[in-house]
Design a protein with these regions (language model features):
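Non-heme Fe(II)-dependent double-stranded beta-helix
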Residues: 3-11, 16-72, 78-175
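A short secondary-structure junction signal
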Residues: 156, 170-173, 187-188, 199-206, ...
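A short beta-loop-beta micro-motif enriched in histidine and acidic residues
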Residues: 175-185, 239-240, 246, 268
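Active-site region of the double-stranded beta-helix
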Residues: 150, 175-182, 193-202, 208-211
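Short, conserved beta-strand element in jelly-roll/cupin
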Residues: 182-198, 245-246, 276-279
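Glycine-rich nucleotide phosphate-binding loop and flanking beta-alpha elements
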Residues: 84, 183, 260
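Double-stranded beta-helix
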Residues: 198-258
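Non-heme Fe(II)/2-oxoglutarate
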Residues: 12, 18, 23-25, 53-55, ...
Length: 318
């Protein structure tokens, strides 16, 4: 009932009721995903007719991803990497923008590591032309559109450094198994901006664990908790555990309702950019992203795509 009321509240006031995400977790713990499908279908916006893709940094001659694989497994690798120039721009950005080390915002210094994870502010990221270009990319938008079978909303960009700091996997750095539930339906596209191998923190997923009735009630009854490798290993076949490695510039899309985690780093540092898409904004109430320095092309794009960019707050755009 509370989530239903929040749906009505969202349509009137353009935000969810407080603690809607907690209510979603409680529902998920009870029905193992059935209600999420209902609310997604209730709130989703009819998708537009597919047109020829023109605005993209990728080559146009083949699809970036297998929609069937993404639906079946809960994740899928993109067939093309980001070009070297774009990767270099993003890496440079990660050395010139300040990031949060758990106590304060600092420039990342690999010679002075004090935490497992260094997070960049989404409002800083949204105002960078290299990230605006990816947000506008029609190939990436179409991945979310296909997965939702509806028009997507861009939720937020996220970027962070991971380090080998500490002796045990960090819950705060998402290095224990968990699932995400801030929206009723969402998709994340992850870009590795450094080479990622067994030593420096590959993502791990439990294949197909995004599906209805895919999670054991014994784990769901714990609520929104991190789960150790040993405990979760009691419930899934070893073949279901997948490790995603890749060279810098490689990317994959994932429904992080799957059980997933980042592996603890042994050496080196890992830089990841994540683009978040949602079918609706029901769930956690994040502040709208403050766009202060849009490029001319980003201004025009946002004017033409007001639904996709409804989570943005523009300053002096018009």
């Amino acid at each position: 009932i509370y989530v239903s009321l929040s749906c009505v509240y969202l349509k009137i006031f353009r935000k969810s009721l407080k603690n809607t995400n907690n209510a979603l977790v409680n529902l998920y713990s009870i029905d193992n995903g059935k209600t999420l499908i209902f609310f997604h279908n209730t709130l989703k916006t009819k998708r537009l007719k597919k047109t020829k893709i023109s605005n993209t940094i990728y080559e146009n001659h083949k699809p970036l991803i297998s929609a069937e694989e993404l639906n079946e497994k809960g994740y899928a690798k993109l067939s093309q990497n980001l070009n070297t120039n774009h990767v270099n721009e993003l890496v440079k950005l990660a050395t010139t923008l300040k990031c949060f080390n758990g106590e304060k915002f600092v420039l990342f210094d690999e010679k002075s590591i004090t935490n497992t994870r260094y997070n960049f502010d989404s409002n800083d990221l949204i105002n960078q032309s290299s990230i605006q270009q990816l947000i506008m990319d029609e190939y990436l938008i179409d991945i979310a559109r296909e997965y939702f079978d509806s028009e997507p909303i861009f939720d937020m960009p996220v970027m962070w450094w991971s380090t080998p700091f500490g002796n045990v996997p960090s819950s705060n750095a998402a290095q224990l198994y968990h699932y995400d539930l801030e929206r009723v339906k969402w998709l994340k596209i992850f870009f590795y901006l450094t080479d990622v191998n067994d030593s420096n923190g590959p993502h791990q997923y439990i294949e197909k664990s995004h599906k209805v009735n895919s999670k054991p009630i014994e784990l769901l009854s714990k609520g929104y908790k991190r789960i150790s490798d040993d405990e979760i290993g009691n419930y899934y076949n070893i073949d279901s555990f997948k490790v995603i490695k890749g060279l810098k510039g490689s990317a994959f899309a994932a429904d992080t309702l799957c059980w997933h985690k980042g592996t603890k780093l042994i050496k080196g540092n890992r830089l990841v950019l994540e683009l978040n898409y949602a079918s609706s904004l029901l769930g956690t109430n994040h502040e709208k992203l403050k766009v202060k320095t849009p490029t001319d092309s980003f201004k025009l794009f946002c004017k033409k795509n007001s639904f996709y960019t409804k989570n943005f707050k523009f300053e002096k755009l018009y």
